[in-house]
Amino acid sequence: MHTFSCLLFLLLSWSTVAIAADSRPDFVGRQVCASCHAAQEKLWQDSHHDLAMQEATAATVLGDFSGKEFTHAGTTSRFFRKDDRFMVRTDGPDGKLADYEISYTFGVAPLQQYLVAFPGGRLQALGIAWDARPQEQGGQRWFHLYPDERITHDDELHWTRLNQNWNGMCAECHSTHLQKNYDPKLKSFDTRWSEIDVSCEACHGPGARHVDWARKKPGWEQHAGNRGLLMVLDERQGVHWQPDASTGTARRSKPREGSAEIEMCARCHARRSVISPAYVHGEPLLDHYLPRLLDAGMYYPDGQIQDEVYVYGSFLQSRMHQAGVTCSDCHEPHSLQLRQPGSGVCLQCHAADKFATAAHHFHKADSAGASCVECHMPPRDYMVVDPRHDHSFRIPRPDLSVTLGTPNACNVCHRGKSAQWAASQVQDWYGHVPQGLQNWAGTFAATRGGDPGAGESLLQLIRDSGTPAIARATALSQVGPYLNAQSLEVLVQGLWDDDPGVRASTTGMLEQLPAGLRVQLALPLLEDAVRAVRIEAARGLASVPTGDLDDRQQALLEQGIQEFIDSQLASAERPEAQTNLGNLYVQRGQLQQAEDAYRTAIELSPAYTPAWVNLADFYRSRQDEAAAEKTLREAIAGMSGVADLHYALGLSLIRQQQAAAAVTELQQAATLNPDSDRYIYVYAVALHSTGKPDEALLVLQGAHNRFPNNTDILGALVAFNRDQGNAEAADRYAKKLQSLLPAASPWPVQGTDRSRIQGD
């Protein structure tokens, strides 16, 4: 209670914290740029980049602070003015109402968020935002970003908690030359920027040398080649799109030779992890960030956007990317507006007489169905009111909606119709089902469902050079359960792929190989051109004994280990990073550092389950099962309904010969997470082991109905039915198991400790 009382005092008594501007001499500021580039500055003014973040003033605040009230989760918040300040009375970190001053606005349309200063240099994003859309569109109102969830002060999504912290979650992409400056010892921030918004040098890089070149200052000649710019964005220079009458689609006059522009945009328009202490303009994206693959929960099996993944991952899947299209082919890079309104931007390259006709789209002119974007870039709403378009430019596939439940553009408009109706319409129009480029939905759906027969289709996908690299990288990341001689060959090829994302994904799989083979394959990757590959290689080699390597190899490994540590310290305020450090220290035998890292993760976010589970597993590995159990019970006391914790506790109790208590915990885990075939299987085995074979069989039969291709469940059904004398049932399950086993024939892998959870 003392801690919260002190904190409440601070909340009520501090003055607004101003974030300092950084005046590093290599960043010169927009005004200097505008002295030569006035036209570009004019386009940029009032753009979303210009208005990305602003001090809260009467000119910048869009929300109604006239005493308006808004109620969510039982808390009524009031927005009001106090002299020239904008204030909100709402629930704070202790759940009590208090008055907070709005320090900054964040964004402008279709919503505007507000930032509040807290001790330790923190800015927190209020969970209630202003709907900036016109009133006739439902806007001009306060709304909660999680309208269907009861977000109270003890929830991880509450506005005062870590996941709504501006410094670590938002700041880098809303200001120029943002330096987070987190101090792990003080657990505080000294965040600085060169400019508050996304200005010229956010994209073009520091301009001091460019100014020296332009003004012919002493030594300017040495910068003449790139005009003093670290980021040279010239991929469209001297390029035109040549119409092709036979296809109706224009072709780039020369191949795109680099990806500087796309990667520059991807820095903020991608779902990614930070892997370096400081971004350097002009260096490869994967030297500083690791973009998410087409993972479950992030993307649908066919690659359509699902979670808030922005646009980079979807664009990499597209024919546009393969054809050499860059972001600025469609978007004017200063105003951010489309180069032509509506379908006009598409018709720059796609002939209107071929594509803007009913013969192509089968809809009335000027209807939504005749819009290129509505059909090929269907939107998905984020932050309640912000529709964002999928940039994979795909052919609508309602047939996949029928078989896999993925969304499709047709039913976005035709909400009253079924997916089968839409699929039949497409079949009637074309006489077949147009496939498009993205043909991996069935494969990824199978791997996500644990289908043991999915291995062969994964290999086919990986081997197809026409498949976008991000899909091949995703497939390689899913090879683990299907490792055999064939897939090992594909893995080895992936390590030397031209695409760094493919190499990084493949390198991450090496930890599942036997130690000797892993060392043989991973050592050369410590010298890869990009950091993302090097740190994955180092992580996979972290447990290799020093004596197994020569001096040069050991030096390379130590360098890679340090790069990995630095990559995690770049997000030291996050529990995921601290958990990853703990895992590394365990592999390295640095036990005190491992325990400290896990405990730091828990301190940063007591609701972060992997840190608790890994700390308990750390104690188990030291033969301190009592400490492991105590850790898990402490976690469960603070978090109700977390399956992973009950499962880990059940295993701990089994190791302590407390079988009856273990069954209770394992049952709880299986109940809380009925989608986990592993939890249900282990629960059934525990029932059988405690003399409850009939109950075990009932659980297994139910599990088999849900997971018909799970070989562990089938194997247990064979064994348990034989034990019960059910020969017919045992034989039936055995035949099915045998039919699946050849496809699931595993490569003999070195068991990575499956109880240790990586931070995400």
PLM ranges: what are they?
Residues 572, 606, 640-641, 674, ...:
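Short coil turns that delineate tetratricopeptide repeat
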Residues 469, 500-503, 531, 575-576, ...:
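Helix-start (N-cap) detector for alpha-helical repeat units in TPR-like alpha-solenoids
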Residues 512, 540-543, 587, 621-622, ...:
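Register position in tetratricopeptide repeats
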Residues 452-462, 484-496, 514-526, 548-565:
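Amphipathic alpha-helical scaffolding segments comprising HEAT/armadillo-like alpha-solenoid repeats
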Residues 458, 564-565, 598, 632, ...:
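Hydrophobic/aromatic packing residues within the alpha-helices of TPR/SEL1-like helical repeat arrays
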Residues 31, 39-107, 113-119, 127, ...:
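Primarily the internal scaffold of c-type cytochrome electron-transfer domains
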